[in-house]
Amino acid sequence: MNKTQAQGIGFAFFAVVLFSLSLPMTRWALEGFTPLFTATGRAVIAALLAMLLLKIVRERITPPDHRKEFIYTMLGAVFGWPILIALALLRTETAPVAVIASIMPLTTAIFAVLRGHENVSNQFWIASLIGTGILVFFTASRSSFDGNDLIADLLTVGAVLASSFCYVQGAELTRIYPGWKVISWVVIMALPITVPVTIWLWFQVEDRGAINTHATIGMLVLGISSMYLGFIPWYRGLKDAGTARGSQVQQLQVFMTLGWSVLILGESVPPLTLACSIGIVLAVTWAILSRQGRSKSLQVAK
C-alpha cells in the first residue's frame, strides 16, 4: 500500500466517524420528526450549507458538465438510501434493517469491480466476506426480529444497492472534481424536489410542540455531518485508496455507532460487541493490506 492509498484510508476512516453519528442523531431527530421528513429535511440543510460555501469561494452552484453522472449520484445519496431506509423502518424494527445494511461494504466493492473496473485479489474477497459475516452475525444476535416484513427487506436491499452505487459513482466524479464540489452539487441539484417535499411534510406534523432540543440537534447534525461533511473525506478516501478497498473501512461504522451510543445515549457495550469489534478490525486490516491488482477507472466523457 503506497502513501496515496494510506492517505485514502485515513480520509475514509474520518468519514466513517462522521457517518457513525447517523443512528444516534436519527434517534434524537425522530423524537420530533417523522422518518420521511428526517430524510428530506437533512438534504435541504446540506444544500443550504453547500450553497453558502460555494458562494464564499465564488464557485458555480451547479456542475459545469457530467450532469448525468451527478444525477445518478443524487438519486442514490439524497433519495435512494434515506427514503428507502425510512420506508423500511416504518414497517419493521431496526435490527433486521441493520443486518441487511451490513452487506453494504461488500456490495460497494462489487460495484467498484463491475462499474469502476477495479481489480482486487482473492484475499480481499475472503477478508471482505469474513468481515461481512461477522457484521451479520453481530447485528442478528441483537434482536429477535419480531415484526420482520418482506417488503421492508426488499426496501432495505434497494437502499443498500442505491447507496453502494452512489458511492462508486461519486468516487469516480472526484477524479474530475474535488470531493466537496461533488457532494455540494449533488445536494443542490436535489433542491427542486427536496424543498417542496420537506415543506409539505412539515405541514403534516400534528404536534410541533414535540420538536424538542434533541430533535433539533439531531436534524442539524444529520444535515451537516451525515449528508454533507462526511461525504467530502469519504469520496476523497474512495478515490485515493480505491473504492473497493476504501469501502471496507465502513465495516467499522456499526461499532463506532455503538461508541457514540455509549457516550451520547448512555447505552452499555456487552462483551460480544468487543469480540466482534476485534474480528472486524482484523478483517478490515486484511482487506486493506491485501495485494492490489491493477485498476482502470471508469472513463467519464467530457
Identify the function of each model-found stretch.
Residues 50, 108-110, 114, 128, ...:
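Transmembrane alpha-helical segments that form core, pore/gating elements
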Residues 1-40, 87, 145-172, 193, ...:
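Glycine-/small-residue-enriched transmembrane alpha-helix faces in small-molecule transporters
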Residues 4-9, 31-36, 40, 62-68, ...:
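Juxtamembrane helix-entry segments on the extracytoplasmic side of multipass membrane proteins
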Residues 37-48, 76-77, 85-119, 135, ...:
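Specific alpha-helical transmembrane segments that line the substrate/conduction pathway
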Residues 50, 120-142, 251, 260, ...:
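Hydrophobic transmembrane alpha-helices of multi-pass small-molecule transport proteins
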Residues 18, 22-23, 51-101, 137, ...:
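Specific transmembrane alpha-helical segments of multi-pass solute transporters/efflux pumps
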Residues 39-41, 82, 97-103, 169-192, ...:
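Helix-helix packing/entry segments at the starts of transmembrane helices
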Residues 17-20, 24, 51, 75-79, ...:
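Hydrophobic/small/kink-forming positions within alpha-helical transmembrane segments
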